[in-house]
Curated annotation (Swiss-Prot):
Superkingdom of this protein's organism: Bacteria
Protein name: Phosphoenolpyruvate carboxylase
GO biological process: carbon fixation; oxaloacetate metabolic process; tricarboxylic acid cycle
pH effect summary: Optimum pH is 8.0.
Keywords for this protein: Allosteric enzyme, Carbon dioxide fixation, Lyase, Magnesium, Manganese
Oligomer and partners: Homotetramer.
The keyword Transit peptide appears for this protein: no
Designated gene of the protein: ppc
EC number: 4.1.1.31
GO CC term, one of those recorded: cytosol
Temperature dependency: Optimum temperature is 75 degrees Celsius.
Leading EC class: lyase
GO molecular function per UniProt: magnesium ion binding; phosphoenolpyruvate carboxylase activity
Organism: Rhodothermus marinus (Rhodothermus obamensis)
Length: 936
């Protein structure tokens, strides 16, 4: 009998608990492979792992050649089993690593003291404020300024099926149980059997969906995380803040909630024809129903807990008056009234539940009248309970028990759960406005007008009370959809103003790009322009939503400040800003900018745009919030959220921030409650530091003009290198040959097409940034996360060696520069050019000039980064990540070699044989995504 799958990670710099977990899971996986596929299959899995490990550790590429030779001769069934085995291995290792993160955080918490709190915790931030002389009032004022809004999206970067995600969560729970509990021998035996069975089910579960998820599927997936881990994590964050204030200031005080969630799932229409107005309505109402149902559950628990008898705890007068009013307005079943006639607190909770039940009935049956009861009234009822408990001398129960948790939930999630954004491309609004103006007889060829005339015309129509669409006129399907979308928004905000918050305009280039959707909103009664009834002069605007420009390309980012200057200077738009309380949100796109200009240019253009946009808003006296459209990978603005906050320009730190949580990032950050809590506390820590301690995000004191000139030069050099690669005549042909981009475009992982034209017509311009990055990650080049910086840094240091000390100083003291270089290092360590060379040689007829260009820039980047950071090897500052990548590489290499073989067979085989090979190729894409812990 063969031994279980050998992992051999002890003594390699990995902690003993992680080593034990990985070896346990690997051993069980080996047993399951042997049981399901036989000892020969397990031997093949182990042989390939050993060969690739020897090739990596001993720098002996001939061992990798031997591995590929064996894969080349493998049967289809053998290739399929290799993919299943190695993919399952990475699913298991990823859970073990998450448990290791949780273990380390718990260990640090146990070792922490009030004087030395856990790093990146809320305690650490509050202590830092105290040490810098901030008073309690200062800290409370700072908390009042905080406005943190994570935004979940359905971007197509989560390759795993929900069935796989649920099994991973179950395995994580068992690993946690094993780590935390002292199990009896019988319990340990049961747990190992359960783990074995879960791994068996994992191996037997299809990795690839049979068909694309629908938008409703995506909504339900997002809501799963919101109503489970996020729902549980948010009250813990507020309790952390209260505890820190008690610990360091001796104060038990209330503060305004600062953390709220937003969502695009079910409302992001840009490029997704399946997000219809009906879907958006269904999404919002589903969220409302779920919020009300969760509150009913919370209230049942609270009612069970507050078993206070009026005979022992006399109800205050305020509670008695409230119950009398409730009795007039809410009808409760007689048995409930009898049951709680001497338990006033429970009776009050029952009346609250009765009101929520009425709201749920009205959702299910619109003919039923809904109670006049909103989230604010719900919060006030909970506050009444809190005051009455305090009046009874039960202050701890009032302020440090289940009621406080429910109050936080109500203030955070309201009756809307999460606020939706609607997003649409600017060209869609342009076409709809052109059609309406033509039908109204106002302008036959709006699209031919210059921008100045467009603005004049739009301003005239926005101030004109009559609608554009003549009675009975028929419009195109596209225009009907746009108008219906605004009508749905109007309907939803009338039900609850928090259901929809923003209308985001993709590819905002001009002032008219924002005026056009305002005109469409006016057409359905969502936007109102009102003159002063006495003088007839311009009065004011009424509008319940924000209009948000989205700047995405390098050109748009470089021009963002001047465009925002023009937008805020427009008299009608300025009235829109006034209608929103003098507030303007601005969104920045991290994905298209990197695809457009490369890693360094995109990062610098985004940094400068933030700085300049903040200055424009401040100059106009406008309160602003920047919305960061970050992806999960470094090539799309990913990385640790708290480091990204610290790296932002100091001028933007006004306490407000939004950022997207996309695709696989959602399941990584929110699948486990402890990981979700850690993610959120790091964000709050960073926001407290940058707003309360401005030096936290400062620079080394270099003259800004000098700094900007040097960074502009580096960005321009980097972009030239990047564009020289991707603009080369044969580049697109090479890229489509050596990467599985064609299969990625068909991968059924999201409702949205990968191309802006169609999923079957892919070229560079229409290809979205997500599959662009996804494909580079699969073949281990990862160029969106680093390429171009080699030429930029090397040329600068060659021509101006005196700048080396400047760059070293920046790395030590400028968070932005340090973060950009550290993120690039991480991607370079994860890149594996020796594996990429196989794709180039066997699929691209290489070695090609493209591979040589990439390899040369890699080595130039590595040399320059090591000189600037004074390291011996990349990621010396983060040896745990470096070691994790090194340990993963041999296993990932096997997946890459199998994928390579499948791509060769698809291209050389008969059409009749290609479909099963394509299915296997989909599985290889999932496997490598699991190994790399990222897609696009």
């Amino acid at each position: 009998m063969l031994p279980p799958l050998q992992i051999e990670i002890e003594g390699t710099g990995i902690s003993r608990p992680l080593s034990e977990h990985v070896n346990l899971l690997g051993g069980l996986l080996g047993q399951v492979i042997q049981e399901m596929a036989g000892p020969e299959m397990l031997e093949l899995v182990e042989t390939l792992r050993r060969l690739c490990k020897q090739a990596a550790q001993e720098n002996r590429p001939e061992f990798r050649e031997q591995a590929y030779t064996r894969i080349h001769s493998a049967t289809y069934d053998e290739l399929l089993w290799l993919l299943r085995a190695y993919t399952a291995f990475f699913h298991l290792v990823n859970q073990a690593e998450q448990q290791e993160i949780i273990r380390i955080n718990r260990e640090r918490a146990q070792q922490s003291t009030p004087e030395r709190p856990r790093p990146e915790s809320i305690d650490e931030a509050i202590l830092a404020l105290k040490q810098q002389g901030r008073t309690l009032d200062d800290v409370l004022t700072l908390l009042e300024r905080l406005d943190i809004q994570p935004t979940v999206t359905a971007h197509p970067t989560e390759a795993r099926r929900r069935s796989i995600l649920y099994k991973q969560q179950h395995i994580a729970q068992m690993l946690s149980q094993q780590r935390r509990c002292q199990l009896t021998p019988e319990e340990q035996e049961t747990l190992l059997l359960d783990l074995h069975n879960q791994i068996t089910l994992l191996l037997g579960t299809a990795e690839v969906r049979e068909e694309r998820p629908t938008v409703r599927d995506e909504v339900e997936q997002g809501l799963y995380f919101i109503q489970s881990t996020i729902w549980e994590a948010v009250p813990r964050i507020y309790e952390d803040v209260r505890r820190a204030l008690r610990r360091y200031y001796g104060a038990d005080v209330d503060f305004r909630p600062f953390l709220r969630y937003r969502s695009w799932i079910g409302s992001d229409r840009d490029g997704n024809p399946y997000v219809t107005p009906e879907i958006t309505r269904w999404t919002a109402l589903t969220q409302r129903r779920l919020a009300l149902q969760r509150y009913m559950e919370e209230l049942r628990q609270l009612r069970r807990r507050l078993s206070l008898s009026d005979r022992y705890v006399a109800p205050p007068e305020e509670l008695r008056r409230s119950l009398a009013r409730d009795a007039r307005e809410v009808s409760l079943p007689p048995h409930v009234l009898r049951q709680f006639r001497h338990e006033s607190f429970r009776l009050k909770i029952s009346y609250i539940m009765g009101r929520l039940h009425g709201l749920l009935q009205a959702l299910d049956d619109p003919t039923q009248p809904a109670p006049d009861y909103d989230a604010d009234a719900f919060v006030e009822d909970l506050r009444l309970l809190q005051r009455c408990l305090e009046a009874c001398g039960l202050e701890r129960i009032a302020r440090h028990d289940q009621l406080t948790r429910l109050l936080v939930l109500a203030q955070t999630f309201g009756f809307h759960l999460v606020t939706l954004d609607v997003r649409q491309h600017s060209s869609v609004h342009e076409a709809a406005v052109a059609e309406l103006l033509r039908l109204a007889g106002v302008e036959n060829d709006y699209r031919a007008l210059p921008e100045s005339r467009r603005q004049e015309l739009l301003a005239e129509e926005l101030s004109n009370p009559r609608p554009l669409l003549p009675p009975g006129a028929r419009v195109s399907e596209a225009t009907r959809q746009v108008l219906e979308t605004f009508a749905v928004i109007r309907e939803l905000v009338q039900l609850d103003p928090r259901l929809v918050g923003s209308y985001i305009v993709s590819m905002t280039h001009t002032v008219s790009d924002l005026l056009e959707p305002m005109l469409l909103a006016k057409e359905v009664g969502l936007w109102h322009y009102e003159r002063d009834p006495r003088t007839g002069k311009p009065g004011h605007v009424r509008c319940p939503i924000d209009f948000v420009p989205l700047f995405e390309t390098i050109e748009d980012l470089e021009a963002a400040a001047s465009r925002m200057e023009a937008i805020l200077s427009h008299p009608v738009y300025r009235m829109q800003v006034a209608a929103r309380g003098g507030f303007q949100e601005i969104m920045l796109g991290y994905s298209d900018s990197t695809k457009d200009g490369g890693y360094w240019m995109a990062n610098w253009a985004l940094h400068r745009a933030q700085e300049q946009l903040a200055e424009v808003c401040l100059r106009h006296g406008v309160d602003f919030r920047l919305f960061h459209g970050r992806g999960g990978t470094v090539g799309r603005g990913g990385g640790r959220a708290n480091q990204a906050i610290l790296a932002m320009p100091p001028v933007v730190h006004n306490g407000r921030i939004r950022f997207t949580e996309q695709g696989e990032v959602i399941s990584f950050r929110y699948a486990l409650p402890e990981i979700a809590h850690r993610h959120l506390e790091q964000i709050v820590n960073a926001m407290l530091r940058v707003v309360g301690l401005p030096a936290a995000s400062g620079t080394d004191g270099t003259d800004p003009a000098t700094r900007n000139r040097l960074m502009d030069e580096l960005a321009a050099r980097s972009m030239r290198a990047y564009r020289r690669l991707i603009d080369a005549p044969d580049f697109w042909s090479w890229y489509t040959r050596i990467t599985p981009i064609d299969q990625i475009s068909r991968l059924p992982i999201a409702s949205r097409p990968v191309s802006r034209s169609s999923a079957r017509e892919v070229d560079f311009e229409s290809l979205r940034a997500i599959p662009w990055v996804f494909a580079w990650t699969q073949v281990r080049y990862l160029i969106p996360g680093w390429f171009g910086i080699g030429q930029a840094l090397d040329e600068l240091l060659q021509t101006s060696p005196e700048h080396l000390e400047t760059l070293r100083t920046w790395y030590r003291s400028w968070p932005f520069f340090r973060t950009v270089l550290q993120n690039a290092q991480r991607e370079m360590v994860r890149a594996r050019l020796e594996i990429a060379a196989y794709y180039d040689r066997l699929l691209g007829d290489g070695p090609t000039a493209f591979h040589q260009m990439i390899e040369e820039d890699y080595h130039r980047a590595r040399t320059a980064i090591l000189r600037i950071t004074d390291q011996e090897s990349l990621l010396d500052h983060d040896p745990i990540i470096r070691k994790s990548v090194q340990l993963r590489n041999p296993y990932t290499d096997v997946l890459n070699l199998v994928q390579l073989e499948l791509m060769r067979r698809i291209r050389s085989g008969a059409e009749a044989d290609r479909e099963p090979l394509r299915r296997a190729l989909f599985l290889s894409i999932n496997g490598i995504a699991a190994a790399m812990q990222s897609t696009g």
